[in-house]
């Protein structure tokens, strides 16, 4: 079975900007039903749009890009994965940002590959598969 992917906010922001080519080329090769959006990522993106001086344009661009993508709600299985991951990271003294931790937990719980340009933080999470489509890694 082919991998399914969870797109991080930095990946979607780059796609909204129309760059880099490596990311855009990869996105068009993946079937839409294999691309997932976390409700947490959508909240981050909506916040960015609302803080923009050009809110209307940012809202429209975000809606167009995410049209057809059903945001994954944060469910009980995600919460349990979050608890395991956070406890493990705290034991190592290697905690990551709170929203990144929630997003990583969703990816782990649902066996999704997280697509992000922030691999340095995400690679601290045991069991998280992640890729960087912006740099071809």
PLM-predicted stretches and their roles:
Residues 8-9, 45, 82, 107, ...:
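Generic structural signal for small/hydrophobic residues in well-ordered secondary structure
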Residues 11-12, 41, 78, 103, ...:
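Alpha-helix capping/helix-boundary segments
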Residues 3, 69-115:
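Active-site neighborhoods of divalent-metal-dependent phosphate/nucleic-acid chemistry enzymes
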Residues 2, 104, 108-137:
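Acidic, PIN/NYN-like endoribonuclease modules and their adjacent C-terminal/linker elements
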Residues 26, 39, 61, 68, ...:
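Residue-level recognition of specific faces of alpha-helices
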Residues 1-37, 49-64, 136-137:
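Short, well-structured N-terminal submotif of metal-dependent ribonuclease cores
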